């Protein structure tokens, strides 16, 4: 029975890990064992980071909407409440964008929400 040669598979696996570890400092990008640990850790951080990014952007949008609302004499919570009451379906991202880029249209949306 011939022996099983799997050298090329192992080499490919190691090369894949070392390629992902490119840019890491010191032996973290040179030695396979250390690089493998660091790549796994980096992937965990990347996964968590993708979740945190959504949280952080939502809080940024809320802060921007609140700041623009207070310039117009109201609060964030009352703005959101009046938008829901008047059935104006506009998300926080768009509201924040309007508040920063086009304050006049933001004021119009606020007034139409209050009027309804």
From Swiss-Prot:
Keywords: Chloroplast, Plastid, Ribonucleoprotein, Ribosomal protein, RNA-binding, rRNA-binding
GO cellular component: a single term: chloroplast
Coiled coil: none
InterPro entries per the UniProt record, alphabetical: Ribosomal_bL20 (IPR005813), RIBOSOMAL_L20_CS (IPR049946), Ribosomal_protein_bL20_C (IPR035566)
A Pfam family matched in the record: Ribosomal_L20
Keyword Oxidoreductase: no
Localization in the cell: Plastid, Chloroplast
One example of a Gene Ontology biological process annotation: ribosomal large subunit assembly
Subcellular location, principal: plastid
Keyword Ribonucleoprotein assigned: yes
Protein function: Binds directly to 23S ribosomal RNA and is necessary for the in vitro assembly process of the 50S ribosomal subunit. It is not involved in the protein synthesizing functions of that subunit.
Family matches, as HAMAP family: Ribosomal_bL20
Family affiliation: Belongs to the bacterial ribosomal protein bL20 family.
PANTHER family noted in UniProt: 39S RIBOSOMAL PROTEIN L20
Protein name from the UniProt record: Large ribosomal subunit protein bL20c
Organism from which the protein derives: Rhodomonas salina (Cryptomonas salina)
Protein's gene: rpl20
């Amino acid at each position: 029975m011939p022996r099983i040669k799997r050298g090329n598979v192992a080499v490919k696996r190691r090369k894949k890990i070392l390629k992902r570890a490119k840019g890491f400092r010191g032996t973290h990008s040179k030695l396979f064992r250390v690089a493998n640990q660091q790549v796994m850790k980096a992937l965990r951080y990347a996964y968590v980071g993708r979740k945190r990014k959504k949280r952080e952007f939502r809080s940024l949008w809320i802060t921007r909407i609140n700041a623009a609302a207070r310039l117009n004499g109201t609060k964030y919570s009352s703005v959101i409440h009046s938008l829901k009451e008047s059935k104006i379906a506009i998300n926080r991202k768009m509201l924040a964008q309007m508040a920063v880029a086009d304050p006049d249209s933001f004021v119009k949306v606020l007034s139409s929400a209050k009027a309804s």
